[in-house]
């Protein structure tokens, strides 16, 4: 029996050390090294030239709701088209590696609403709306209907006076 225990222990250690682990690769939609202000400046210039607004998604690779939103938009052609047609998009990182504090301060500390949080800037870079994403959720994800309504209500054309006659 004394000889059997070391053999079993050795076999156990060997099997554990050779066991394959299948870990899901980390999702990286946000770039902690990105210059957020420069990205916003480029998006604002493009938006102004194209009569669009800027859609900023603030979050991080650590945030499951941020990933879910990103995946939903990319997997739903109608949402992707609506976003691309009406907005210049910026993914603004907030993480321990880079909290982008100066940029988020200028944007009125949107993280107070949780993550992801969505910001709409006009073609001059002025913040015109901050959206708590919780209001766009349904069940364990976001609602396509609610997101569609949100994006339609804050696009460039929706805010033109001629489109708002009562």
Briefly describe each language-model feature range.
Residues 35-53:
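A short beta-strand-turn-helix
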Residues 50-55, 85-90, 114-116, 123-125:
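Loop/turn elements at helix/coil->beta-strand transitions in domains of secreted/extracellular proteins
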């Amino acid at each position: 029996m004394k000889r059997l225990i070391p053999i079993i222990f050795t076999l156990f250690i060997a099997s554990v050390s050779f066991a394959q682990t299948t870990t899901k690769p980390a999702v990286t939609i946000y770039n902690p090294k990105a210059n957020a202000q420069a990205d916003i400046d480029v998006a604002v210039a493009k938006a102004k030239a194209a009569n669009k607004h800027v859609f900023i998604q603030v979050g991080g690779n650590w945030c499951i709701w941020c990933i879910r939103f990103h995946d939903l938009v990319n997997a739903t052609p109608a949402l992707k088209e609506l976003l691309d047609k009406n907005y210049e998009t910026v993914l603004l990182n907030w993480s321990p590696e880079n909290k982008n504090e100066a940029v988020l301060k200028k944007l009125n500390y949107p993280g107070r609403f949780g993550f992801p949080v969505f910001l709409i800037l006009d073609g001059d870079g002025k913040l015109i709306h901050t959206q708590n994403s919780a209001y766009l959720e349904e069940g364990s994800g976001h609602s396509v209907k609610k997101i569609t309504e949100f994006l339609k209500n804050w696009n460039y054309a929706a805010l033109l006076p001629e489109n708002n006659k009562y």
